[in-house]
Amino acid sequence: MGARASVLTGGKLDQWEAIYLRPGGKKKYRLKHLVWASRELERFACNPGLMDTANGCAQLINQLEPALKTGSEGLRSLXNTLAVLYCVHSNIPVHNTQEALDKIKEKQEQHKSEPKKPEAGTAAAADSSISRNYPLVQNAQGQMVHQPLTPRTLNAWVKVIEEKAFNPEIIPMFMALSEGATPSDLNSMLNTVGGHQAAMQMLKEVINEEAAEWDRTHPAPVGPLPPGQMRDPRGSDIAGTTSTLAEQVAWMTSNPPIPVGDIYRRWIVLGLNRIVRMYSPVSILEIKQGPKEPFRDYVDRFYKTLRAEQATQDVKNWMTETLLVQNANPDCKQILKALGPGATLEEMMTACQGVGGPAHKARVLAEAMAQAQTATSVFVQRGNFKGIRKTIKCFNCGKEGHLARNCKAPRRRGCWKCGQEGHQMKDCKNEGXQANFRKGLVSLQRETRKLPPDNNKERAHSPATRELWVSGGEEHTGKGDAGEPGEDRDLSVPTLNFPQITLWQRPVXAVKIGKEIREALLDTGADDTVIEEIQLEGKWKPKMIGGIGGFIKVRQYDNITIDIQGRKAVGTVLVGPTPVNIIGRNFLTQIGCTLNFPISPIETVPVKLKPGMDGPRVKQWPLTAEKIEALREICTEMEKEGKISRIGPENPYNTPIFAIKKKDSTKWRKLVDFRELNKRTQEFWEVQLGIPHPAGLKQKKSVTVXDVGDAYFSCPLDKDFRKYTAFTIPSINNETPGIRYQYNVLPQGWKGSPAIFQSSMTKILEPFRKKHPEIIIYQYMDDLYVGSDLEIAQHRETVEELRGHLLKWGFTTPDKKHQKEPPFLWMGYELHPDKWTVQPIKLPEKEVWTVNDIQKLVGKLNWASQIYPGIKVKQLCKLIRGTKALTEVVTFTQEAELELAENREILKEPLHGVYYDPGKELIAEIQKQGQGQWTYQIYQEPYKNLKTGKYAKXRSAHTNDIKELAAVVQKVATESIVIWGKTPKFKLPVQKEVWETWWTEHWQATWIPEWEFVNTPPLVKLWYQLETEPISGAETYYVDGAANKETKLGKAGFVTDRGRQKVVSIENTTNQKAELQAILLALQESGQEANIVTDSQYAMGIIHSQPDKSESDLVGQIIEELIKKERVYLSWVPAHKGIGGNEQVDXLVSSGIRXVLFLDGIEKAQEEHERYHSNWKAMASDFNLPPIVAKEIVASCDKCQLKGEAMHGQINCSPGVWQLDCTHLEGKIILVAVHVASGYLEAEVIPAETGQETAYFILKLAGRWPVKVIHTDNGPNFISATVKAACWWAGIKQEFGIPYNPQSQGAVESMNKELKKIIGQIRDQAEHLKTAVQMAVFIHNFKRKGGIGGXTAGERIIDIIATDIQTTKLQTQILKVQNFXVYYRDSRDPIWKGPAKLLWKGEGAVVIQDNGDIKVVPRRKAKIIRDYGKQMAGDGCVASGQDENQDME
């Protein structure tokens, strides 16, 4: 493909360029006419290669001639061009197009008048032209005989399959190898494919489908065939299964022939297309050019995927024309759009050559191209060839718009005219070339004016003219070169000893080309070296090279030597009209020249809005004149630096901005209120989950602390997302429209900035960390800590290397914040060589405190508690409980004042922490402070704390010290793992006996590491102990309470075994409170020992946890009474079960309060529970029991009294996700699978924990339920090849959990426990374990209700799968309906209206939406057609010829 610029060479090209387009005209044929003709021939599906010879041109003319009468002007021009080209090839002298046409006409007439020569040997010639590789060949007798496929052909096919598998290339390869083959030959080819049986099965299915379709469309004739007549082939005959080779040959050579081979080939290609689609699942729509991907690589991927697409050639052509450009990256897209819609692939690839490099370079090229194109067209139209507008330019800094005497940049050393040092420009006596580029441009202008007028239009499209047009400033002429002018570019790497060229000016150097010395621009953006007219030795050949916006004609000299600053290289030099001599990459790469940008582009992170959301459209609120002025200044500066860009009214989004004054400064700071955009932006995963702590630092000999300047503003923002960051600076009194900007970099205050910056910074530092493993770098946001055990000089040298590395990526480390000497201020801490502390904290002294003041105060105290032990904030926090305004004044309580005074005393003495020594043991010591507050210290040596902290979280309303202590230990252990990666040894203020007494009853509360007892008052103790057995001789109290929900009136009382009883009335109470009141009453009325029997699980649960403090006054009173007693036994019995004392007290407290309910079904529920051990929800549902009764039945079962329940986290609950795990019981292995969304269970005892058994179980599971994903641990059976193969075959995705982290397998781990619990309850009902397992699975799936919807796991999984299918169908239906447009007529208006959007289609009417209005139209007055989209619809589209029902089904 592509334009052919080398049709003519040497003298013939000169002959071509001497021929005029018209008789008497001024314009002559040029090389561009050949390029245009070849492009047009491609459009007409003709081979442009035929233009290379006279015979080829004659064939093309004969082909086009019949269409000339009805053809367009373009077709006639093409025929004329080919006629002239034919004359040039045939050496027929002509002066213009008309003469060429006349000459060809004469030749055609001569040819007609010549007698025809005998055609002897034509058959032989024809026969020789036929490839002998075809299976059907003609023998000497003229008969068509079959020649089997050669082993070489079959071997080539097998090799293709082995190497390419089923890539798109396989289809053209198959077509080429099977040209003219019979079905038998094709089956031979398919049979040679050994592997890929799955693909072959798919192919077989496609062939069967097509054969069946053939039989349907070609029914067999009825009755016997006449003698001598051949039968018509059936579908199976075409596939070669029921036909002989002789029959196949006869069908293919009959008159008329039935090409059974071609038909079968077509079927095979259909099947191969389907296989290729499966093996290459990438859609053409997904092929997009990466930001740094070369255009050539992108085109290769595009066409490779296009070949796999199952679409007609027309659709593929459309894809090529539109998608190739649409999915290019922004830099290439801008260039491709400028080339126009008719550009060939060769032109595209030429124009985009080198653009796939750094984004900065590509952006510059694209901008220059856009500017040049618009500028040249205006330039030509106006005829402004008289001169170019000159702009003033500074000799000092090279920028436009001011003179050197007004320049604010530092004065450049040396003379501004010649560049030499020792004198200034006014004293310069050197009349040679100027140091800057203006003199060269002036001479070019003079030369340009000498151009002949008839060449102006053509020259306008050449790079020479374009360069002159844009060369008023270096903004355009310099950007495409090796650098940009400006103060940021004078950066060099001091460690390199190579020649360096400063980029204050464009990098122009004296270069020796052949024997001549010329000034040339070193351009790393140019592929080729192009020099203006120079005499070189050797032969040359003509060539066209593509500039941006056009082509120029040059002479190509090969093997030319060039000397650049003492370095020699040999390569190709192009000589032609160029505005500036250019040394391109073909020479620069040979001499090792590299372009070192101070800001190399960081790869942008793609960002999107949340699905279904649009950008923010929040109006800008009014601002004062002072703030508007400040914002304008700030934004003007930011725009110069490229951080923001101006935008027009086409951007509909807006975010409000405002300004505040900086602390201790008169300067203003711009703030953007990104709250609305943050709500709409996708979620990000924070790369760092917390901040580093100095206690985790190891002591280092040398330390440096630095700061990254303008951190966020050094990272580019995704181009497609920038529009959503738009904001507006308003004007006073709406004097002018607001100035609109959008961000090009990460904005402050936007939710994605921290995560993107952290990710980018980590990638940038990674190579440096690998290079210097002896250096430790802590990086959190823009703070850097660099530590090492190197000598200080060597350390600082490495730090400077790090600064240089960051600078290459555009990150500066300002000297102002570069700390070389201790103490180092880092992350709010103060670091000394052998200790650390928090930066000095001063607590404010205030008369009046607001909520905001208290919040800041608590924050400071929390920060200080890292190193100051004993800090408390509980009473201060109580002051700001509830929802209060930030400015609301707070009145201090006495406790809060005391707490603040204590904290002030603690902070008076400065305290320090030490650094971590990996060789020593970590120890954590915990003390109780009272009022639910705890403090702790972590150290390695006594009195040298690494870190301190406090804890004051109350996790439940009723608690005790041991519960809190367990929570403190867990917090300290977690903190230690985060900072040091291991848990410390604990010293706890509790005795072993007290702890173990609690622990035996409440072991499920939490996990506790190794610990030892420390006698640090106040000691933690249990204030009372409940007896485990009834106390003989003590009075037994049956207690009960009841309340009326409506009146809130209640009664509480007790009955004793000695005949005593008491009932009290209570107001404003609940059932639970009344039950507790009854226990309190019994405790108050009893002696030092008592047995208490209650029917309240609630009361029983609270008191059994042995709290020593509670937020409930009632529970507090019970605790006080329990502490006074010597011994108390508390027991529970189910209510309403005919238990003597319980029944009597129930009758006492129920009178007038609640009606006694006759609860039918209790016995049946109990029987079922004894058999299946159903949970309370299942029984409450199945037997219509109140929840409390069902719970009491479960609670009274000794097999169901297991302690503790698992706490659940969040896991993937998609409908197709299952978790698998192996658990062990009775020395056997049980493989368990849990449907995560429903809790449905499948389990089986397997003989061995092998991949084979696991794979078999997975296949059985997949055969019963729709399994999409299985989540397993990293056990050897799950990671085996057998399991992977089973998952691949069944189309199941396999995911793995996190090693040594059971939470990642939460659902199945929990189900293992549940399964074992159920097995334990019913084990005595089964002889074998495998029977018990299946019984337990049945009970869990169908006899236990609860969870979402209160249904069983079996009901839930069926409901989830059914809902998923319905949802998918509904979505598909909605999408299908949306593909149709409706044309309709109103009742009185005969004109068809539309197209409208189809919302719903019924039998008698349709619901449509037209311009926002929803209408119901009778079915007979509506036409429904498929909407093929604007690009697909053509003139031949017949809307009414659709079967809408079929399309919509």
From Swiss-Prot:
Q: Kindly state the positions of the motif Nuclear export signal in this protein.
A: 16-22
Taxonomic path: Viruses, Riboviria, Pararnavirae, Artverviricota, Revtraviricetes
* Residues bound to Zn(2+): H1169, H1173, C1197, C1200
Annotated region (Dimerization/Multimerization of capsid protein p24) at 279-365
**Region feature (Interaction with host AP3D1):** 12-19
Q: What is this protein called?
A: Gag-Pol polyprotein
Q: Where is the Reverse transcriptase domain?
A: 641-831
* RT 'primer grip': annotated span: 824-832
